């Protein structure tokens, strides 16, 4: 027996094992094959049990790694989700093909997984992709893990798997405390402000809500606002930006020095501005190309 609010989880990829464990008073399932067994979600849903779904190739006999972020996202769609599914993008070296850079990109794009509308689990405790950044051994890597834990929670992680429970708890509380406050109100009409900072993050939510992958990219390009400061502009370049802004709804705030300005708009706005102001000067073309490339 244990004290406190411990939750007992059975790690299995087979629905028969999950059913037996849940019927024997286990609380949840950890499926490292990501519902490769198509009956797993049915078993968990029928028992109203939470299930952690780890991204994996769709092979029940050979769990493995999925390398690219887009492929991880698709793997987590396999055989659907239950109301109590927790998605796990699966950090770590499950195969030789998966590199530290793959894990770093997944961590960098962690907010995208909020597009499922489900809780996110991260297993990042002393992982290689973090230790390598700081040049630390496994024994020395606790501070590295704690820093990443705060960042993961701020980016949307709800569950953190760890071997350093007390310290990780504190790091998670700091991440939660200083996460950006968003609107969330329940009523006759519920309102929730989504945590969206990039076009790719917006596209995940648009795709979930509309079910139209073809339309999601265009809609997502209107979802975030970026602010850039341009300096060293001449009068002709500023005039071209003013003219383009009247067509694209780009907001310009001109500096008092006569050569700088702030440009405020969505990725779609900046894309239209780059087209409308094209050809005035190679310097302005290059600056606008850097902006549009960063907002794609």
Q: Which functions belong to the PLM regions below?
A:
Residues 1, 5-8, 16, 28-72, ...:
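Active-site-adjacent loop and "lid" segments of alpha/beta metabolic enzymes
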Residues 4, 62-70, 78, 173-244, ...:
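Haloarchaeal acidic low-complexity proteome signature biased toward cell-envelope/secretome components but also
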Residues 88-97, 102-105, 216-224:
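Active-site pocket-lining segment
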């Amino acid at each position: 027996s244990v004290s406190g609010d411990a939750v007992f989880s059975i790690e299995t990829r087979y629905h028969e094992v999950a059913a037996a464990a849940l019927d024997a008073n286990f609380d949840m399932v950890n499926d490292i094959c990501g519902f490769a067994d198509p009956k797993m979600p049915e078993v968990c849903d029928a028992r109203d049990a939470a299930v952690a779904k780890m991204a994996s190739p769709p092979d029940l006999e050979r769990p493995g790694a999925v390398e690219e972020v887009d492929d991880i996202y698709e793997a987590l769609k396999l055989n659907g989700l239950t109301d109590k599914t927790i998605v796990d993008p699966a950090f770590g070296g499950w195969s030789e093909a998966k590199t530290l850079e793959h894990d770093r990109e997944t961590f960098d794009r962690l907010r995208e997984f909020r597009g499922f509308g489900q809780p996110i689990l991260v297993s990042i405790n002393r992982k290689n992709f973090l230790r390598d950044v700081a040049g630390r051994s496994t024994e020395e890597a606790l501070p590295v893990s704690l820093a990443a834990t705060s960042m993961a929670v701020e980016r949307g992680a709800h569950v953190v798997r760890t071997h350093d429970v007390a310290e990780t708890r504190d790091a998670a509380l700091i991440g939660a405390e200083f996460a950006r406050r968003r609107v969330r109100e329940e009523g006759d009409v519920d309102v929730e402000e989504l945590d969206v900072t990039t076009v790719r993050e917006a596209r995940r939510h648009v795709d979930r809500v509309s079910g139209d992958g073809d339309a999601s990219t265009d809609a997502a390009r209107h979802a975030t606002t970026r602010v850039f400061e341009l300096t060293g502009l001449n009068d002709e370049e500023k005039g071209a930006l003013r003219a383009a802004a009247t067509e694209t709804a780009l907001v310009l705030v001109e500096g008092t020095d006569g050569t700088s300005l702030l440009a405020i708009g969505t990725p779609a706005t900046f894309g239209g501005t780059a087209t409308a102001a094209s050809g005035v000067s190679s310097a302005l073309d290059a600056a606008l190309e850097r902006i549009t490339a960063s907002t794609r």
